[in-house]
Design a protein with these regions (language model features):
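Nucleotidyltransferase catalytic core that binds NTPs
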Residues: 1-171
Length: 171
């Protein structure tokens, strides 16, 4: 659901039914096992899981990297909506020029629980997030060896090494 007002109405209906609302936000670039474990774990904290997906523009700003994301926002959102543990997916694009999230999603839906990881937000941002959520849960990394950055860097490194090897062979 891309329209926040429509999402709010839907979440309000769930609340009327007594459902506990859980929210998490991420880039979800190069979806991998760590992401999936994290989403499954997040869903365990409530009845409805709302997943915010950072826009392409936002990722470029906060990662300070024009090469990211690898996967366009529409495709990342589509992959997330196919995950059984995810109830709603929405786009996050309220990121200021310094790359800081402005919290519009959680200001509007006021989740019972917001799930994050240690490295996702500064202490100042965590204080802000706590204002708009009844509870904030910080999960550890869900994959010891896998991250989008490691996948990208590992793949690029292998390709560069192979190209260099070919160039050396050709003289």
């Amino acid at each position: 659901i891309e329209d926040y007002q429509e999402l709010k109405k839907t979440i309000d209906a769930h609340r009327t039914l007594g459902h506990k609302i859980v929210c998490t936000v991420g880039s979800w670039d190069m979806l991998h096992i760590g992401h999936l474990r994290y989403l499954i774990k997040s869903r365990e904290y409530g009845d409805v899981l709302v997943v915010g997906t950072d826009s392409d523009r936002g990722i470029k700003l906060y990662k300070k990297n024009n090469l990211r994301p690898i996967i366009p926002q529409e495709e990342r959102m589509e992959m997330l909506k196919y995950q059984e543990c995810v109830d709603y997916v929405t786009l996050i694009d309220d990121i200021d020029d310094s790359g800081k999230w402005q919290y519009e999603l959680i200001k509007l839906i006021r989740p019972d629980t917001f799930i994050t990881t240690v490295e996702s937000y500064s202490e100042e941002q965590m204080k802000d997030i706590k204002q708009y959520s009844n509870e904030v849960i910080v999960l550890p990394r869900q994959a010891q060896y896998t991250s989008s950055t490691k996948i990208i860097e590992g793949t690029v490194k292998k390709h560069i090494e192979a190209l260099l090897s070919e160039m050396i062979k050709k003289g």
